[in-house]
Amino acid sequence: EEKTETEQEATEEAEAAEGEEVLTVWCWDPNFNVYAMKQAEALYQKEHPNFKLDIQEKVYTDIEQSLITAAEAGNYDTLPDIFLMQDYSFHKDVANYPEIFTELTDSGIDFSQFSGGKLADSTVDGKHYGIPFDNGATIMAIRSDMVEKAGLTVEDFKDTTWSEFMELAKKVVDANGVPMLTSSGGSEIVIEMLQSAGASPMQDGEVKLVDNAALKKAIEVYKQLIDEGIMVDYTDWDQYIASMNKGEAAGVIQGCWIMSSIQAAEDQSGEWAIVNMPALDEIDGATNYANCG
């Protein structure tokens, strides 16, 4: 019996679906991570036309909670094939929930193409459990127009300590009526402060709170930023990005990937400048540089 045109199309679609190779990925930030996933899918499809990447946007806190829930329930069917992780969570999660991760050491991936610093985040006991995704060099992006309104220049914010930054930031807050910094509501900025001084909240795989001068100083700085209205904290990612795009904050300290979200506000073109982050006061080895990927 000869098939109708509609039946033939349905058959072809079913056959195509059977041949599809689909992987699911969880990630956040449509301007950077989601965009990169779409580009990766398109590149891979050139040689694998039946491949499809099911990209599901989830904020990182939701991803981590889903990982914990699945691990504690012993039900991994709810998890995707691929998920993005914050650098600073990798060692903790591999140690606590090793069954979630697939060892990639002998996968055929040439890990020599990646920098040692980034590989260290996803390497545990000499074994690879992830693939570096971005460089994430920390930047402080500031609104040059808001800074100038306070009688300051972008140069004033370069190579500062946190105490110096606080005094400058107060002037910007007073002149513009908005916080100097916006934050994504996590521990990222505290981790970046620690990294900038070559410090960590961990030692030998355990949390080190006692005799950790850098951690104490970082928490003091964070508290001052919030208490004095210099920084506003958002737990919602969209609100965090909107605070930059709508001029509700004069700056942000984040991995350099945040620039794609800043650039989404085309009406602010030419009004942003990049400097390095402040260094912790009175901490040996403190610098103005860190990483957040």
Regions found by a protein language model. Name each.
Residues 1-24, 46:
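Short, low-complexity disordered leader/linker segments with a strong preference
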Residues 16, 84-139, 166-168, 197, ...:
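Hinge/lid segment of periplasmic solute-binding proteins
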Residues 18-30, 51-56, 81-82, 129, ...:
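Short, well-ordered beta-strand elements
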Residues 30, 84-89, 186-187, 237, ...:
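Beta->alpha turn/N-cap motifs
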Residues 43, 47-114, 149-151, 250-251, ...:
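Extracytoplasmic "Venus flytrap"/periplasmic binding protein-like
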Residues 46, 52, 122-188, 200-235:
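Helix-loop-helix "hinge/cap" segment bordering the ligand-binding cleft or interdomain interface
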Residues 46-47, 52, 73, 224, ...:
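Extracytoplasmic/periplasmic substrate-recognition and gating elements
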Residues 61-65, 199-265, 269-271, 275-277:
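Extracytoplasmic ligand-binding clamshell segments of periplasmic binding protein
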